Curated annotation (Swiss-Prot):
A GO BP entry: threonine biosynthetic process
Matching InterPro entries: GHMP_kinase_C_dom, GHMP_kinase_C_sf, GHMP_kinase_N_dom, GHMP_knse_ATP-bd_CS, Homoserine_kinase, Ribosomal_Su5_D2-typ_SF, Ribsml_uS5_D2-typ_fold_subgr
Residues the record lists as binding ATP: P82, L83, T84, R85, G86, L87, G88, S89, S90, A91, S92
Lineage: Bacteria, Bacillati, Bacillota, Bacilli, Bacillales
UniProt similarity note: Belongs to the GHMP kinase family. Homoserine kinase subfamily.
UniProt name for this protein: Homoserine kinase
GO molecular function per UniProt: ATP binding; homoserine kinase activity
E.C. number(s) listed in UniProt: 2.7.1.39
Record field: catalytic activity: L-homoserine + ATP = O-phospho-L-homoserine + ADP + H(+)
PROSITE patterns: GHMP_KINASES_ATP
Protein species of origin: Bacillus cereus (strain AH187)
Subcellular location(s) of the protein: Cytoplasm
Chain segments annotated as coiled-coil in the UniProt record: none
Amino acid sequence: MIPLSIRVPASTANVGPGFDSVGIALSLYLHVVVKEESDKWQVIHSFEDSIPTDDKNLIVSTACKVCPSLSPHIIEVTSNIPLTRGLGSSASAIVAGIELANQLGNLNLTTDQKVQIATNFEGHPDNVAASILGGTVIGALDGKNVSVVRIESKELGVISLIPNEELNTEESRSVLPDVFPFHEAVKASAISNVLVAALCQKKWEVVGEMMERDHFHEPFRLELVPLLPSIRKCAKEFGAYGTALSGAGPSIFILTPYEKRQEIAEQLARVFTSMKVCELEIDHRGITVNKEEHIGL
């Protein structure tokens, strides 16, 4: 068979007040290379031992749920997306699994169908839609119906501060309240609305201001990511637009003017020496599939 390669970008979600709705694709990638058929699924990887190497692997289990009749294959998986750091590692695996089923099962899924299926697996569209479409996405899940709008943000630079500590999404969600007062919801929703409008109109200073005024989740997660206020203060002093938790954390996501991203990243690295400071870009392509006779990662 002609080798098949799937590349899925990482993503950051929320961007402050866009909780479970706004996502941005990032220039870190999960690669899946599909090799020969086999009598059972085999996943070759160099991750920690807790990541399955059989049909229990998230990529494979997702693919088999989408297309139960798939023939088992050997696949090789590599990734520079940190696990359980709020950069969409599980979402990228789900998206890769859907595309694996699409390619091997000849499903001819549309982009909208991929987003719908991925959102059903993930429970919210922000990470998965960003990984599929690239760029910045704003999405909503209403029952089983998903609506997603994609916008370009090519003038922006991205910096991620990644701690050594992991933070499980379930743990980070457990600190969120079950009930949100109506007046707080109105205030939080208004801030989110302005964030989205500013993203669409490329008013980056307003974007930065709104992404630091979340009421939905960041106030409750501060105990899990105590460095956020000091990182936010320094980033602003160094010329960044704004700072927010990346997804559920613990990574921190910073938007900057594109031309200043390297300078700001270097300044932050000198201050926050316990964290890995990554100068990233927004990925504008989304998931890509390559069918060539010679594929290298």
